[in-house]
């Protein structure tokens, strides 16, 4: 059993990161792992990854299954249209999953196969830490990315002291743009490139005013967390990972 508001939030927070790869159907869905300690929802397309954890909905017996994107989208519409927060009963066997709430029953086939080992993709040692205003970063990336290369859609972060330089260029069109933002940065001077579309999708998914971005080297993934100094311990945790784009000199 899971509350409708929690389930709806879990779907919203993860579904945008699913892949549409015909070759790897597992990535076309959202992994749901239910344990005695809580529930984890994971989505990835190999460029970005979202791991959304809830400690307030656990089960007696561990189980995991991959939920397809289309039924989840439909389910989310039903959950959102229902104004009151209600309990959703989730039942599954090897091939199907069933959601029961109010007057609705939604049955869907599960995606066959084994989900990739997503924990192996999450780098553990990330000494370079950036804390910055989410809206300011989002707006800046949007503006600068207009001048990015059409093929890579790359924006470059140059971090030094408490300054973040965001830079993009399109050599074919002979255009470039740069903006400098104030930030709180602890770590070594570094340059790292990201796909602007993936990055703005991630930033759109952060609910807090500030965000924390952890990085190690330019060829390893960056990790984004919501950041709130005053926040109490909550029952939810979200980790978003974005793969870098190789820097073109």
Residue ranges and their predicted role:
Residues 1-249:
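Structural preference for solvent-exposed beta-strand-turn elements
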